[in-house]
Amino acid sequence: MLQNSTLALTDHEVLSISTVLDAVRKLDNAGVDQCDPLIITQASSLSQLPVESSSLDIVISICRSLEFPCDKLLAEISRVLKPGGTVLIQKTSQSVAGIKDGETSLERKLLMAGFLEAQAIQLKPVVPSEGAQSFGIKAKKPSWKIGSSFSIKKAEKSLPKFQIEDDMDLIDEDSLLTEEDLKKPQLPVDGDCEVGSTRKACKNCTCGRAEEEEKVEKLGLTMDQLNNPQSACGSCGLGDAFRCGTCPYKGLPPFKLGDKVSLSGNFLVADI
């Protein structure tokens, strides 16, 4: 097997070394003076390159056919190039429109073959002829190997740490209370009036019974009528709409006969 740092492929029958070196110079290669390229002519019939894998720095393809190099040959070029190696494909067109279409098609073809950084460059035609113009596309083989893998370390998230000082001043809740707050509340007396079958308000009544009796007196009702309401007509408990003009229960809310009638504290207080 032949080995060399630079390989030139062409579908021409003859290709001069100077043409290959001019193409190498377009790649800004500093070692072009020491370059001794390997040239393969009529390479369109090749299905495999006679070069070891990952042994070349540069592969140059100078062709006149639009189908050269084919997809299979591009895969071979990728095989023989070192990781990060450069490939240059030079073609000829008779029109400016053909150059634009050829560059676009060739860039897409190289990207589909796995090459990176496809870029168009201007080149001299291999065979000078009237109206013929050359164009070239250079690209690079990825610097990593196909099928290589590496592990990605997941960044560990640390929870924020809060420092609590043990000697922090704590407020005693009892110190917030005043002397008035500490006094025991006095519960109201249930009833200090006389206890019996007929309870009446005492002289110094403080439980509110005197006020209730005063309201009853204004209505003209007796305590017996309130405690045991009776009705001769049977309509007194239905409400004012059914009561007669002299009904003693007029003004009271509806109630059931036989139930004790209770007055609210604001029964006789004016609304306005």
Curated annotation (Swiss-Prot):
Keyword vocabulary terms for this entry: 2Fe-2S, 4Fe-4S, Cytoplasm, Iron, Iron-sulfur, Metal-binding, Mitochondrion
Name used for this protein in its record: Anamorsin homolog
Entry binding sites for [2Fe-2S] cluster: C193, C202, C205, C207
Residue span of region Fe-S binding site A: 193-207
Short sequence motif Cx2C motif 2: positions: 244-247
Cross-referenced Gene3D superfamilies: Vaccinia Virus protein VP39
Species this protein is from: Vitis vinifera (Grape)
CC annotations in GO: cytoplasm; mitochondrial intermembrane space
UniProt similarity note: Belongs to the anamorsin family.
Origin superkingdom: Eukaryota
Region (Linker): 153-182
Motif (Cx2C motif 1): 233-236
Cell location: Cytoplasm; Mitochondrion intermembrane space
GO BP: iron-sulfur cluster assembly
Family matches, as Pfam families: Anamorsin_N, CIAPIN1
Binding residue positions for [4Fe-4S] cluster: C233, C236, C244, C247
Record text on subunit structure and interactions: Monomer.
GO molecular function: 2 iron, 2 sulfur cluster binding; 4 iron, 4 sulfur cluster binding; electron transfer activity; metal ion binding
